[in-house]
Amino acid sequence: TRSVEEYAKEILAMGINTVDSFDIHTQITSLRRSLDESAKAGKAVAIISAGWDPGSDSVVRTLLEAIAPKGITYTNFGPGRSMGHSVAVRAIDGVKDALSMTIPVGTGIHRRMVYVELEEGADFKTVEAAIKSDPYFVNDETHVKQVPCVDDLNDVGHGVNLVRKGVSGKTHNQLFEFDMKINNPALTAQVLVCVARASMKQQPGCYTMIEVPVIDLLCGDREELIAHLV
Protein backbone atom coordinates (compact mmCIF):
# COMPACT_ATOMS: atom_id res chain seq x y z
CA THR A 1 0.00 0.00 0.00
CA ARG A 2 2.72 2.48 0.91
CA SER A 3 4.30 2.04 -2.55
CA VAL A 4 1.07 2.46 -4.54
CA GLU A 5 1.47 6.16 -5.30
CA GLU A 6 5.05 5.84 -6.55
CA TYR A 7 4.43 2.87 -8.85
CA ALA A 8 1.01 4.01 -10.05
CA LYS A 9 2.43 7.35 -11.19
CA GLU A 10 5.14 5.59 -13.21
CA ILE A 11 2.59 3.35 -14.92
CA LEU A 12 0.03 6.10 -15.54
CA ALA A 13 2.74 8.22 -17.19
CA MET A 14 3.05 5.44 -19.79
CA GLY A 15 -0.67 5.70 -20.55
CA ILE A 16 -1.53 2.44 -18.81
CA ASN A 17 -4.54 2.13 -16.48
CA THR A 18 -3.95 1.12 -12.86
CA VAL A 19 -6.11 -0.43 -10.15
CA ASP A 20 -5.04 -0.95 -6.57
CA SER A 21 -6.30 -1.99 -3.14
CA PHE A 22 -4.79 0.92 -1.18
CA ASP A 23 -6.23 0.53 2.31
CA ILE A 24 -5.03 3.34 4.57
CA HIS A 25 -8.46 4.96 4.87
CA THR A 26 -7.22 8.33 6.14
CA GLN A 27 -4.97 8.83 3.09
CA ILE A 28 -7.40 7.88 0.31
CA THR A 29 -8.53 11.40 -0.60
CA SER A 30 -4.97 12.72 -0.86
CA LEU A 31 -3.94 9.73 -3.01
CA ARG A 32 -6.94 10.34 -5.26
CA ARG A 33 -5.96 13.97 -5.82
CA SER A 34 -2.36 13.02 -6.56
CA LEU A 35 -3.14 10.23 -9.02
CA ASP A 36 -5.93 12.19 -10.71
CA GLU A 37 -3.35 14.67 -11.98
CA SER A 38 -1.02 11.89 -13.15
CA ALA A 39 -3.81 9.92 -14.81
CA LYS A 40 -5.11 12.89 -16.77
CA ALA A 41 -1.59 13.82 -17.87
CA GLY A 42 -1.04 10.27 -19.13
CA LYS A 43 -4.56 10.00 -20.61
CA ALA A 44 -5.13 6.95 -18.43
CA VAL A 45 -7.44 5.79 -15.65
CA ALA A 46 -6.60 4.96 -12.04
CA ILE A 47 -9.11 3.32 -9.72
CA ILE A 48 -7.88 3.27 -6.15
CA SER A 49 -8.83 1.48 -2.92
CA ALA A 50 -10.57 -1.26 -4.89
CA GLY A 51 -10.62 -4.21 -2.55
CA TRP A 52 -13.62 -5.18 -0.47
CA ASP A 53 -12.96 -2.55 2.21
CA PRO A 54 -12.27 0.05 1.15
CA GLY A 55 -13.91 -0.90 -2.12
CA SER A 56 -17.09 -2.93 -2.53
CA ASP A 57 -18.14 -2.20 1.08
CA SER A 58 -17.82 1.49 0.23
CA VAL A 59 -20.45 1.00 -2.48
CA VAL A 60 -22.77 -0.70 0.01
CA ARG A 61 -22.30 2.13 2.52
CA THR A 62 -23.07 4.68 -0.21
CA LEU A 63 -26.28 2.89 -1.22
CA LEU A 64 -27.48 2.60 2.38
CA GLU A 65 -26.80 6.27 3.05
CA ALA A 66 -28.75 7.19 -0.09
CA ILE A 67 -31.86 5.25 1.01
CA ALA A 68 -31.60 6.34 4.66
CA PRO A 69 -29.90 9.77 4.50
CA LYS A 70 -30.08 10.38 8.25
CA GLY A 71 -28.56 7.75 10.50
CA ILE A 72 -25.43 5.93 11.56
CA THR A 73 -23.50 3.20 9.75
CA TYR A 74 -21.30 0.76 11.66
CA THR A 75 -18.73 -1.31 9.77
CA ASN A 76 -17.50 -4.24 11.85
CA PHE A 77 -14.62 -6.22 10.34
CA GLY A 78 -13.64 -9.78 11.15
CA PRO A 79 -12.69 -11.72 12.96
CA GLY A 80 -10.08 -12.37 10.33
CA ARG A 81 -6.61 -11.76 8.98
CA SER A 82 -5.88 -8.29 7.65
CA MET A 83 -3.47 -8.61 4.72
CA GLY A 84 -2.48 -4.93 4.79
CA HIS A 85 -1.82 -4.88 8.52
CA SER A 86 0.11 -8.16 8.39
CA VAL A 87 2.35 -6.85 5.59
CA ALA A 88 2.96 -3.64 7.55
CA VAL A 89 4.18 -5.63 10.56
CA ARG A 90 6.44 -7.85 8.43
CA ALA A 91 8.19 -4.70 7.19
CA ILE A 92 9.29 -3.78 10.73
CA ASP A 93 12.91 -4.51 11.64
CA GLY A 94 13.30 -7.70 13.63
CA VAL A 95 10.09 -9.34 12.40
CA LYS A 96 10.52 -12.65 10.57
CA ASP A 97 6.79 -13.24 10.03
CA ALA A 98 3.56 -11.74 11.31
CA LEU A 99 -0.18 -12.20 11.45
CA SER A 100 -2.53 -9.32 12.27
CA MET A 101 -6.06 -10.32 13.22
CA THR A 102 -8.91 -7.81 13.19
CA ILE A 103 -11.40 -8.46 15.99
CA PRO A 104 -14.75 -6.61 15.98
CA VAL A 105 -15.63 -5.04 19.32
CA GLY A 106 -18.87 -3.55 17.95
CA THR A 107 -20.23 -0.21 16.71
CA GLY A 108 -17.33 0.11 14.26
CA ILE A 109 -14.63 -0.31 16.91
CA HIS A 110 -11.91 -2.93 16.45
CA ARG A 111 -9.14 -4.64 18.35
CA ARG A 112 -5.92 -5.65 16.60
CA MET A 113 -4.35 -8.91 17.72
CA VAL A 114 -0.84 -9.10 16.28
CA TYR A 115 1.22 -12.30 16.40
CA VAL A 116 4.91 -11.94 15.59
CA GLU A 117 7.70 -14.40 14.93
CA LEU A 118 10.96 -12.56 15.56
CA GLU A 119 14.35 -12.70 13.91
CA GLU A 120 17.10 -14.09 16.08
CA GLY A 121 18.32 -11.40 18.48
CA ALA A 122 15.36 -9.05 17.94
CA ASP A 123 13.98 -7.30 21.00
CA PHE A 124 10.26 -7.90 21.51
CA LYS A 125 9.58 -4.63 23.34
CA THR A 126 11.20 -2.61 20.54
CA VAL A 127 9.14 -4.43 17.91
CA GLU A 128 5.96 -4.02 19.95
CA ALA A 129 6.49 -0.26 20.26
CA ALA A 130 7.14 0.08 16.52
CA ILE A 131 3.92 -1.78 15.70
CA LYS A 132 1.76 0.29 18.03
CA SER A 133 3.12 3.56 16.63
CA ASP A 134 2.59 2.55 12.98
CA PRO A 135 -0.23 4.42 11.13
CA TYR A 136 -1.97 1.09 10.52
CA PHE A 137 -2.37 0.51 14.27
CA VAL A 138 -2.12 3.84 16.06
CA ASN A 139 -5.89 4.45 16.16
CA ASP A 140 -6.93 1.00 17.41
CA GLU A 141 -6.52 -1.03 20.58
CA THR A 142 -3.55 -3.23 19.67
CA HIS A 143 -2.13 -6.28 21.43
CA VAL A 144 1.16 -7.82 20.28
CA LYS A 145 2.10 -11.39 21.13
CA GLN A 146 5.31 -13.27 20.34
CA VAL A 147 4.85 -16.79 18.95
CA PRO A 148 7.34 -19.45 17.81
CA CYS A 149 5.72 -20.01 14.38
CA VAL A 150 3.22 -17.69 12.69
CA ASP A 151 2.49 -20.21 9.94
CA ASP A 152 0.81 -22.44 12.51
CA LEU A 153 -1.79 -19.70 13.05
CA ASN A 154 -2.48 -18.59 9.48
CA ASP A 155 -6.04 -18.56 8.18
CA VAL A 156 -6.97 -16.26 5.28
CA GLY A 157 -10.63 -16.05 6.28
CA HIS A 158 -12.17 -12.66 7.02
CA GLY A 159 -15.55 -10.97 7.01
CA VAL A 160 -17.65 -7.90 7.64
CA ASN A 161 -20.94 -7.02 9.27
CA LEU A 162 -22.18 -3.66 8.03
CA VAL A 163 -25.22 -2.13 9.74
CA ARG A 164 -27.07 1.13 9.14
CA LYS A 165 -29.95 2.38 11.27
CA GLY A 166 -31.52 5.54 9.97
CA VAL A 167 -34.38 7.56 8.55
CA SER A 168 -35.97 7.42 5.09
CA GLY A 169 -37.86 10.65 4.50
CA LYS A 170 -39.81 11.08 7.76
CA THR A 171 -39.86 7.37 8.55
CA HIS A 172 -37.61 6.31 11.41
CA ASN A 173 -36.25 2.92 12.47
CA GLN A 174 -35.03 1.79 9.07
CA LEU A 175 -32.54 -1.00 9.72
CA PHE A 176 -30.23 -2.47 7.07
CA GLU A 177 -27.60 -5.18 7.47
CA PHE A 178 -24.99 -6.59 5.10
CA ASP A 179 -22.92 -9.57 6.22
CA MET A 180 -20.28 -11.73 4.55
CA LYS A 181 -17.65 -14.31 5.51
CA ILE A 182 -14.97 -14.56 2.87
CA ASN A 183 -11.54 -15.72 1.75
CA ASN A 184 -9.71 -12.39 1.93
CA PRO A 185 -7.15 -12.64 -0.94
CA ALA A 186 -9.63 -14.36 -3.27
CA LEU A 187 -12.29 -11.68 -2.87
CA THR A 188 -9.77 -8.84 -3.07
CA ALA A 189 -8.43 -10.29 -6.33
CA GLN A 190 -11.93 -10.67 -7.79
CA VAL A 191 -12.78 -7.05 -7.00
CA LEU A 192 -9.54 -5.88 -8.64
CA VAL A 193 -10.36 -7.85 -11.79
CA CYS A 194 -13.84 -6.38 -12.19
CA VAL A 195 -12.52 -2.89 -11.44
CA ALA A 196 -9.81 -3.31 -14.08
CA ARG A 197 -12.62 -4.08 -16.52
CA ALA A 198 -14.48 -0.95 -15.43
CA SER A 199 -11.36 1.19 -15.86
CA MET A 200 -11.54 0.60 -19.60
CA LYS A 201 -14.93 2.37 -19.69
CA GLN A 202 -13.99 5.57 -17.80
CA GLN A 203 -12.62 8.92 -18.91
CA PRO A 204 -9.01 9.73 -17.87
CA GLY A 205 -8.65 10.51 -14.19
CA CYS A 206 -8.59 8.86 -10.78
CA TYR A 207 -11.66 7.26 -9.24
CA THR A 208 -12.80 5.38 -6.17
CA MET A 209 -15.34 2.58 -6.51
CA ILE A 210 -18.28 4.75 -5.45
CA GLU A 211 -17.63 6.96 -8.49
CA VAL A 212 -17.76 4.10 -10.99
CA PRO A 213 -21.16 2.94 -12.38
CA VAL A 214 -21.73 -0.54 -10.97
CA ILE A 215 -22.79 -1.89 -14.35
CA ASP A 216 -19.29 -1.10 -15.65
CA LEU A 217 -17.93 -3.78 -13.29
CA LEU A 218 -19.68 -6.49 -15.29
CA CYS A 219 -18.89 -8.05 -18.64
CA GLY A 220 -21.63 -8.58 -21.17
CA ASP A 221 -24.15 -6.64 -23.21
CA ARG A 222 -25.53 -3.66 -21.29
CA GLU A 223 -29.13 -4.24 -22.41
CA GLU A 224 -28.95 -7.90 -21.38
CA LEU A 225 -27.46 -6.98 -18.00
CA ILE A 226 -30.28 -4.50 -17.37
CA ALA A 227 -32.90 -7.07 -18.36
CA HIS A 228 -31.30 -9.66 -16.06
CA LEU A 229 -30.57 -7.51 -13.01
CA VAL A 230 -33.32 -4.89 -13.05
Regions found by a protein language model. Give the residues of each.
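Rossmann-fold NAD(P) dinucleotide-binding segment
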Residues: R2-S21
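General beta-strand structural signal in soluble alpha/beta enzymes
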Residues: D20, A46-A50, N76, L99-S100
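Rossmann-fold NAD(P)-binding glycine/threonine-rich loop
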Residues: F22-A46
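Gly/Ser/Thr-rich loops at beta-strand to alpha-helix junctions
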Residues: H25-I28, S49-D57, P79-M83, P185
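Oxidoreductase and adenylate-handling cofactor-binding alpha/beta cores
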Residues: R33-D36, S56-I72, R90-A98, Y136, ...
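Short alpha-helices
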Residues: K43-E65, L192
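C-terminal substrate-binding/catalytic lobe of Rossmann-fold NAD(P)-dependent oxidoreductases
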Residues: G80-R197
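NAD(P)-dependent Rossmann-like dehydrogenase/reductase catalytic/cofactor-binding core
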Residues: L175-V230
